[in-house]
Regions:
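N-terminal pre-domain/capping segments
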Residues: 1-105
């Protein structure tokens, strides 16, 4: 994975894999096996998951009822170019680890 910074945003978490329904690993797929063939197509072709970049990495979790609920490392960075690079690094690290092939706005 190409990085613009030398930082891992989700340390200690490897690629999320299918481990089956008996798995006790909270960071494993129990039912979704991307390579399993269902009705002639792989599951990953039936279920094309996408992560909403803006909503997942640019917001602060606030809504009309209250204050922000989460804070990211890049929130406190003053330089906008650096902030954008950090946000993109974190997003693509997440996309890679969870194994989604798509992202959207």
């Amino acid at each position: 994975m190409a990085k613009t910074f030398q930082k891992e945003y989700y340390p200690g978490i490897g690629k999320i894999k299918f481990e089956g329904r008996e798995s006790k690993n909270p960071l494993a797929f129990r039912w979704y096996d991307p390579e399993q063939v269902v009705s002639g197509k792989k599951m990953k072709d039936h279920l094309r998951f996408a992560i909403a970049y803006w909503h997942s990495f640019c917001g602060d979790g606030s809504d009309q009822f209250g204050s922000p609920t989460h804070f990211y490392p890049w929130d406190s960075v003053a330089d906008n170019d650096e902030k954008i690079k950090m946000r993109l690094d974190a997003a693509f690290e997440f996309f890679t680890k969870i194994g989604t092939g798509y992202y959207c706005f």
